[in-house]
């Protein structure tokens, strides 16, 4: 049997895996157990009551968190003409067309989000095998293929998170940093859950938000009592 690290022993002593914690208690636990030498992210896992094998029950989208994610997001935009100018004014870090595509092909991808205007997809479409596996391929479902590139850039910079269930029907995303206040983490989590409720597939039956757990980058998951959250859309 693998030997438990001191950190894992402390987590096992502190976190009762059989219970759901009131949100402020859950956040206090995360902060207490976050002992890494860097500011850890606060991540969330949401178990959805969907059948992920059925395409009409998959959940995918994006929402802007009220307090952002605590990360400085670099945005690349494929656009030309007026759209390119609008993207630059909105704060895009890199804007281009064929020249930007060449950078991507060389592996020069110093950005976290890619946005494209619809007319630029003829160029972006050739980059699917590079951008796709990295989760960077623009998609209209999450608002990154849009005629309003300026708004997409502002959303990304403001702390928009993109979500998509995995094959087990679980959503994984980041909702902040461990140095956020408990109220900021709570409000970000609530905003995400409201967005997920709105994205509920019509064919999904029974309980939808089955389990919500929060964790830090290096920590264990703490289940949250949804009754202590305000998720009325």
Swiss-Prot record:
Keywords: Repressor, Ribonucleoprotein, Ribosomal protein, RNA-binding, rRNA-binding, Translation regulation, tRNA-binding. GO terms for biological process: regulation of translation; translation. GO terms for cellular component: cytosolic large ribosomal subunit. GO terms for molecular function: rRNA binding; structural constituent of ribosome; tRNA binding. Part of the 50S ribosomal subunit. Belongs to the universal ribosomal protein uL1 family. Binds directly to 23S rRNA. The L1 stalk is quite mobile in the ribosome, and is involved in E site tRNA release. This is Large ribosomal subunit protein uL1.
């Amino acid at each position: 049997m693998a030997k438990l690290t001191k950190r894992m022993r402390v987590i096992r002593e502190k976190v009762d895996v059989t219970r759901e914690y009131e949100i402020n208690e859950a956040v206090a636990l995360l902060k207490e157990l976050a002992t890494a030498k860097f500011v850890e992210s606060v991540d969330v896992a949401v178990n959805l009551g969907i059948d992920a094998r059925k395409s009409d029950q998959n959940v995918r989208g994006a929402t802007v968190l009220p307090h952002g994610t605590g990360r400085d997001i670099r945005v690349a935009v494929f656009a030309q003409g007026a759209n390119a100018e609008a993207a630059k004014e909105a704060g895009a870090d890199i804007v281009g067309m064929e020249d930007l595509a060449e950078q991507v092909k060389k592996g020069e991808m110093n950005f976290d989000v890619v946005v494209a205007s619809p007319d630029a997809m003829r160029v972006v479409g050739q980059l699917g095998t590079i951008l796709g596996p990295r989760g960077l391929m623009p998609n209209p479902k999450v608002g990154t293929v849009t005629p309003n590139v300026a708004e997409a850039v502002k959303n990304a910079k403001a702390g928009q998170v993109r979500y998509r269930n995995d094959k087990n029907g679980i959503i994984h995303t980041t909702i902040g940093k461990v140095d956020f206040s408990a109220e900021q983490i709570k409000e970000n989590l609530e905003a995400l859950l409201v967005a997920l409720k709105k994205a509920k597939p019509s064919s999904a039956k029974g309980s939808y938000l089955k389990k919500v757990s929060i964790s830090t980058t290096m920590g264990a998951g703490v289940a949250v009592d949804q009754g202590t959250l305000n998720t009325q859309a």
